């Protein structure tokens, strides 16, 4: 049986690339601990000089986030008193970031995420909505071949450590207070309401992960639960679901299994 033309063309293509940078014993699941951000986290901005990114970076810097610089394709110099570099790879080499916040418009966000994966940035937070589905599917295929980079999003409010005063995203800062409740949510708005209620109750938050409402997401409920399970700062967990998909059911199965395997959960 002849090989389909498109398959043969792909096999011959000199541009075909492999994104696996780790041994076969490791996988994308091993990157889940990259979600544990804090004061130590060095944050890079892609699309750094844009209006939205600039305002967001100013707020995050004031909050205490350790922003080390940004990327503008073909750019250089400084912005907000921080270095601007032309590529993510150069930023990785010079600034040693632990995470990148991608403030790039949806049509170009996929390429920005790919660049961050190729540079092996440990944590990638993509906030843009309406990234084309074929871009996200391609990105997920890339992520599954490696163990260095972890994606939050796309279409996500981001991730924030209230204890470590580190925000990578656009969550409303006045609602957060340091504490020991971990939160993972699909809906950004519902997560803000949950955070505000916990703050009013005097409890506070440890780590809050906004996974985004898209069906295909870089991080899901189970990933967040695995982080909270070993996080000494988290004593209670809140899951905020949304209609659509099976993520909540998968989380319920994980929790049942957790109670079976832990003698003192």
Please annotate each region the language model reported:
Residues 2-265:
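Catalytic-core regions of core metabolic enzymes
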């Amino acid at each position: 049986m002849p090989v389909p033309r498109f398959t043969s063309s792909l096999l011959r293509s000199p541009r075909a690339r492999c994104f696996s940078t780790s041994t076969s014993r490791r996988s994308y699941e091993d990157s889940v601990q990259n979600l544990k951000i804090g004061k130590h986290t060095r944050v890079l901005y892609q699309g750094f000089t844009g209006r939205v990114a600039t305002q967001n970076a100013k707020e995050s810097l004031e909050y205490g986030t350790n922003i080390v610089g940004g990327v503008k394709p073909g750019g250089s110099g400084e912005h907000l008193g921080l270095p601007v570099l032309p590529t993510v790879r150069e930023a990785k080499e010079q600034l040693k970031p632990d995470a990148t916040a991608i403030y790039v418009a949806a049509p170009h966000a996929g390429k920005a995420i790919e660049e961050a994966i190729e540079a092996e940035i440990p944590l990638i937070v993509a906030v843009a909505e309406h990234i084309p589905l074929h871009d996200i599917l391609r990105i997920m295929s890339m992520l599954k071949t490696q163990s260095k980079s972890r994606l939050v999003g796309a279409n996500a409010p981001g991730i924030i450590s209230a204890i470590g005063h580190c925000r990578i995203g656009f969550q409303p800062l006045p609602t957060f207070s340091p504490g020991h409740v971990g939160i993972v949510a699909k809906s950004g708005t519902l997560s803000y309401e949950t955070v505000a209620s916990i703050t009013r109750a005097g409890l506070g938050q440890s780590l809050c992960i906004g996974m985004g409402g898209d069906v295909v997401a870089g991080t899901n409920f189970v990933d967040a639960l695995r982080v909270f399970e070993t996080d000494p700062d988290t004593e209670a967990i809140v899951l905020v679901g949304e209609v659509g998909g099976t993520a909540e059911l998968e989380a319920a199965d994980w929790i049942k299994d957790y109670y079976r395997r832990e003698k003192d959960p």
